[in-house]
């Protein structure tokens, strides 16, 4: 089993020449490779895409076999991938998914990091995060709009819809956390983001997600204070450890206007640098003595959360951004760790109730013009959604494409299938140079059970019921998505989430149009269904308005 290969540089093909037998198999091939593009992945030489150890394939041997199999896959065959390893090809039918993926799934009693890490070391499992192992990661852009929507809503609730002259304090500039600085600036606030690894600060500077870098609190605060005084938002990455810097900032009397965190606290061994340790020591010891690393990291997380609670008690709006740090702190003895809320129940759930979530697409041509043309089509089809238009304008101006050009925008039930059909028609007419793939994050309204994140504090107490993502995956398979994935542990770590993903290809054919209409209606409809079942009036009204047939819910 080979997991480190510094000689490999993976980039997807572009243009219209196929190396697989159809666009339905060329698409997953290119998107797998795109996940490992050096401008996309965090550690591509180790197959790590983002989120600690979220991988695209189990090892390099498995990667090679997946590539070989996708190239020979027939139009009526389906490839099965088990935790990053291709295990079977079976005859199905042309409207069935070409790939079915299951990553990191464990029987609940054994769903712990300790057991998973043992399997991982033996080469029997792979952590897929959410979009790493499901081959639809598009770089940091993939989380920017969701983060932006959260920060905008925080501004609405706490500062009369105006974040000018305000600043956000956070930590973590990995593949997900790296979206925070740009999202904050887009929302009108300055951002100070703490990050312990210089390489991550450098990557966010290089890709335009971060404006400045600093090495001391004083240096960072001087930049923040100047930007707030001028009401010209900018972002600064501060090199350091959040468990050390947050308590010190509180002690000094520094008070941000908003506070959150996106360190990779979901993975105590690979995701969080213990206080007082160097990065080199951390990397060396997590291979040699992972239990000691986890113990030290968890103790540091408790310190981190206590500091967040101190800021909250001082009047700073504080929110958990879904990395499970509160749970770790509670397990470490911080009894009131959950005193500050998660971002979904606090700010995002009304969107989920309408099936609104992170719709995304990528241009297989590799040509940015294809994305700009689809941006214009979104505006044309949704002329009254001025908030979305503003987002698309900002995205074009501020977001650098990583790997294949792609776009993220939050739209919901009734709009997703219209956009998919329109994109398919653009391919058919030759307005786009090649097909597009349409997918989403697993963080969506009907595709995840995560009691400390997406399904925290559900009205009916059904936070931990994971039937819903299973039903979502089954329905997307039956509806004809091009590839479907079912994962465990994404975002919040082992034992705390189950979630599903789907991707569908718009290749300009009539067959694709039929699949797109089914999948892109049914997928968000499961989110409305799930929230209607939990008793949310917004979801119940949406279900009635859209004519959903929910016999055990609407009666």
From Swiss-Prot:
- Keyword Metal-binding in record: no
Q: In which pathway does it act?
A: Amino-acid degradation; L-histidine degradation into L-glutamate; N-formimidoyl-L-glutamate from L-histidine: step 2/3
Q: Which InterPro entries match?
A: Urocanase, Urocanase-like, Urocanase_C, Urocanase_central_sf, Urocanase_CS, Urocanase_N, Urocanase_Rossmann-like, Urocanase_sf
Q: What is its EC number?
A: 4.2.1.49
Q: Which residues bind NAD(+)?
A: 51-52, 129, 175-177, 195, 200, 241-242, 262-266, 272-273, 321, 491
* Keyword terms, alphabetized: Cytoplasm, Histidine metabolism, Lyase, NAD
Please name the Gene3D superfamilies in this protein's record. Answer: Urocanase like domains (3.40.50.10730), Urocanase superfamily (3.40.1770.10)
Q: Name one GO cellular component term.
A: cytoplasm
**What GO terms describe the biological role, i.e. biological process, of this protein?**
L-histidine catabolic process to glutamate and formamide; L-histidine catabolic process to glutamate and formate
Where it sits in the cell: the answer is: Cytoplasm
Which free-text remark accompanies the cofactor?
Answer: Binds 1 NAD(+) per subunit.
Source taxon at top rank: Bacteria
NCBIfam families under this entry? hutU, PRK05414.1
Please report which protein family the annotation says this sequence is part of: Belongs to the urocanase family.
Protein function: Catalyzes the conversion of urocanate to 4-imidazolone-5-propionate.
Question: Mind telling me what this protein is named?
Answer: Urocanate hydratase
Tell me what organism the protein belongs to.
Rhizorhabdus wittichii (strain DSM 6014 / CCUG 31198 / JCM 15750 / NBRC 105917 / EY 4224 / RW1)
Query: What are the top taxonomic ranks of the organism?
Result: Bacteria, Pseudomonadati, Pseudomonadota, Alphaproteobacteria, Sphingomonadales
The coding gene here is hutU
């Amino acid at each position: 089993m080979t997991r480190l290969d510094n000689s490999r540089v993976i980039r997807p093909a572009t243009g219209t020449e196929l190396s697989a037998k159809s666009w339905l198999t060329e698409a997953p091939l290119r998107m797998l490779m795109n996940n490992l593009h050096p401008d996309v992945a965090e550690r591509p030489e180790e197959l790590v895409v983002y989120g600690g150890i979220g991988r695209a394939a189990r090892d390099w041997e498995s990667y090679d076999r997946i590539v070989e199999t996708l190239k020979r896959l027939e139009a009526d065959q389906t490839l099965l991938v088990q935790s990053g390893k291709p295990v079977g090809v079976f005859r199905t039918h042309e409207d069935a998914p070409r790939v079915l993926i299951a990553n990191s799934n464990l029987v609940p009693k054994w769903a712990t990091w300790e057991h998973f890490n043992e399997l991982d070391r033996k080469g029997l499992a792979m952590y897929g995060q959410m979009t790493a192992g499901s081959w639809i990661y598009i770089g940091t852009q993939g989380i920017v709009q969701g983060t932006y929507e959260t920060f905008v809503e925080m501004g609405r609730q706490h500062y009369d819809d105006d974040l000018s002259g305000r600043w956000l304090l956070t930590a973590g500039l990995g593949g997900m956390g790296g979206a925070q600085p740009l999202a904050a600036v887009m929302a009108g606030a300055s951002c100070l983001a703490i990050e312990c690894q210089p390489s991550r600060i450098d990557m966010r500077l290089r890709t335009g997600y971060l404006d400045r870098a600093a090495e001391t609190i004083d240096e960072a605060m001087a930049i923040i204070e100047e930007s707030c005084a001028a009401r010209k938002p900018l972002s600064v990455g501060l090199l350091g450890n959040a468990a050390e810097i947050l308590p010190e900032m509180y002690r000094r009397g520094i008070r941000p206007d908003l506070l959150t965190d996106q360190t990779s606290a979901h993975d105590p061994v690979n995701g969080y640098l213990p206080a007082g340790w160097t990065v080199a020591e951390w990397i060396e010891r997590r291979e040699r003595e992972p239990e000691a690393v986890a113990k030290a990291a968890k103790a540091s997380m408790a310190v981190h959360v206590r500091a967040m609670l101190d800021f909250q008690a001082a009047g700073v709006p504080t929110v958990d951004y879904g990395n499970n740090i509160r749970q770790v702190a509670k397990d470490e003895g911080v009894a009131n760790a959950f005193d500050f809320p998660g971002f979904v129940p606090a700010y995002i759930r009304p969107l989920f109730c309408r099936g609104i979530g992170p719709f995304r697409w990528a241009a297989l041509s590799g040509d940015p013009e294809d994305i700009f043309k689809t941006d214009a089509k979104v505006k044309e089809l949704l002329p009254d959604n001025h908030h979305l238009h503003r987002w698309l304008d900002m995205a074009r101006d501020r977001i650098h494409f990583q790997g294949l050009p792609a776009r993220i925008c939050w739209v919901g039930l009734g709009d997703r299938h219209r956009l998919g059909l329109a994109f398919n028609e653009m391919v058919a007419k030759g307005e786009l140079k090649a097909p597009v793939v349409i997918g989403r994050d697993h963080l969506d309204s009907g595709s995840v059970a995560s009691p400390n994140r997406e399904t925290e504090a559900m009205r009916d107490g059904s936070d931990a019921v994971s039937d819903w993502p299973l039903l979502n995956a089954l329905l997307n398979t039956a509806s004809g998505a091009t590839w479907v994935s079912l994962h465990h542990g994404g975002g919040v770590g082992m034992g705390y989430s189950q979630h599903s993903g789907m991707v569908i290809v718009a290749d300009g054919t009539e067959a694709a149009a039929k699949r797109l209409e089914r999948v892109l209606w049914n997928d968000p409809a499961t989110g409305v269904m799930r929230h209607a079942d939990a008793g949310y009036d917004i979801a119940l009204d949406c279900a009635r308005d859209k004519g959903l047939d929910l016999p055990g819910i609407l009666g």
